[in-house]
Amino acid sequence: MASTTSRSARPARRNNKASGNTTPLLWMAFALLVVVLDQFFKIVIVRTFTYGESRPVTRFFNLVLVYNKGAAFSFLADAGGWQRWFFTGLGLVVGAFIVWLLYRHTGQKLFCFAVSLILGGAVGNVVDRVVYGHVIDFLDFYVRNYHWPAFNVADCAITVGAVLLIVDELRRVRKH
């Protein structure tokens, strides 16, 4: 039996690949740049600081060398070691999913920029977990005696990427 729905009555699918002139490889190269910057700064800190050492930079910011065996805010840091491989696997799964998203949504520049930042940050921290068994953190912001948990360039990239994803979605919703 023939369908009674006409072709023009179906909702138009957005062609996510047609707009823009970027490729997934460009976005992955940007993610690789994030990984390289993250690892560069971590290597500099590891070579010039001893564990736990803190050097003031401003009245609210120190450079430090600390290790995080857990996730954000040291979540599960004392879990006994299994978390290293759990978070490594999670980072790899998230990375693979993001690569798939980059192929699927290449023309959405802000979206791809955001997930490329997240990809670079995730891979940067996965490298630490595989090579060192923990993530190297070195940025310490504080107010008086309250210190925000130390973090690194990869964490910054993940956070900025997440904020940009929210901005991208809000812009997309506002258009409709």
Swiss-Prot record:
Catalytic activity: Release of signal peptides from bacterial membrane prolipoproteins. Hydrolyzes -Xaa-Yaa-Zaa-|-(S,diacylglyceryl)Cys-, in which Xaa is hydrophobic (preferably Leu), and Yaa (Ala or Ser) and Zaa (Gly or Ala) have small, neutral side chains
Domain of life: Bacteria
GO cellular component: plasma membrane
Enzyme class: hydrolase
Keywords for this protein: Aspartyl protease, Cell inner membrane, Cell membrane, Hydrolase, Membrane, Protease, Transmembrane, Transmembrane helix
EC number(s) given by UniProt: 3.4.23.36
Pfam families, sorted: Peptidase_A8
GO biological process, one term: proteolysis
One term of GO molecular function: aspartic-type endopeptidase activity
List of catalytic residues: D137, D155
Disulphide-bonded residues: none
InterPro entries found in the cross-reference section: Peptidase_A8 (IPR001872)
Transmembrane segments: 26-46, 60-80, 82-102, 107-127, 147-167
Keyword Protease in record: yes
Pathway the protein acts in: Protein modification; lipoprotein biosynthesis (signal peptide cleavage)
Membrane topology, from the record: Multi-pass membrane protein
Chief localisation class: membrane
Transmembrane helix recorded as keyword: yes
Cell compartment(s), UniProt: Cell inner membrane
Protein family per UniProt: Belongs to the peptidase A8 family.
The protein's role, per its UniProt record: This protein specifically catalyzes the removal of signal peptides from prolipoproteins.
Name of the molecule in the record: Lipoprotein signal peptidase
Species per Swiss-Prot/TrEMBL record: Cupriavidus pinatubonensis (strain JMP 134 / LMG 1197) (Cupriavidus necator (strain JMP 134))
